[in-house]
């Protein structure tokens, strides 16, 4: 897993890596170019993103995106791809488009459970596995010179 974002988001990336507690999770926030980000996202099986530029990069590259909307709305800035799972609560107070919750509760994001995000990711993996062509196992031919 790779965590992407700006240099300002590096501490958040560090938190994600700490919670994941795996050497297979890398924080690349602030150390990649835009070209690097496009390459990394296009090679990914799935991208998890808030409503940001990276969400739309993932959509443009054809990578399945799990799009998390809080204070913004998928009605205004949807991922322009059929390969998207949108998580949005549509509360009475949203969309407010504020960077800080004006009501102080941040329910629009807090009510999207981590388990819901992970379920969406696992559904993508399961669909990819079902779509893979399965061939019968055969013994390998001996190598001949």
Predicted segments, located by residue:
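Residue-level detector of flexible, active-site-proximal loop/helix-junction positions
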Residues: 8, 32, 72, 91-93, ...
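Donor-binding and catalytic core of enzymes assembling or modifying cell-surface/extracellular glycoconjugates
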Residues: 1-70
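Leloir-type glycosyltransferase catalytic cores
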Residues: 82-145
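Gly/Pro- and small hydrophobic-enriched strand-loop and loop-to-helix capping segments
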Residues: 61-89
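Non-catalytic, surface-exposed connector residues within folded enzymatic/regulatory domains
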Residues: 31, 59, 78-80, 95, ...
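Short, charged, surface-exposed secondary-structure boundary motifs
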Residues: 36-38, 76-77, 95-97
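Alpha-helix boundary/capping residues
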Residues: 19-20, 41-44, 72, 100-103, ...
């Amino acid at each position: 897993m790779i965590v992407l974002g700006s240099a300002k988001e590096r501490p958040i990336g560090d938190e994600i890596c700490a919670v994941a507690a795996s050497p297979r999770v890398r924080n690349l926030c602030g150390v990649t170019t835009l070209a690097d980000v496009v390459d990394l996202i296009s090679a990914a099986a799935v991208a998890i993103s808030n409503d940001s530029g990276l969400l739309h990069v993932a959509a443009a590259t054809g990578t399945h995106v799990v799009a998390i909307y809080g204070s913004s709305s998928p009605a205004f800035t949807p991922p322009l791809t059929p390969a998207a799972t949108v998580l949005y609560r549509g509360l009475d107070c949203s969309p407010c488009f504020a960077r800080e919750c004006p009501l102080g509760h941040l329910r629009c994001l807090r009510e999207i459970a981590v388990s819901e995000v992970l379920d969406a990711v696992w559904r993508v993996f399961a669909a990819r596995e079902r779509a893979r062509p399965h061939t019968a196992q055969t013994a390998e031919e001996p190598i001949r010179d």
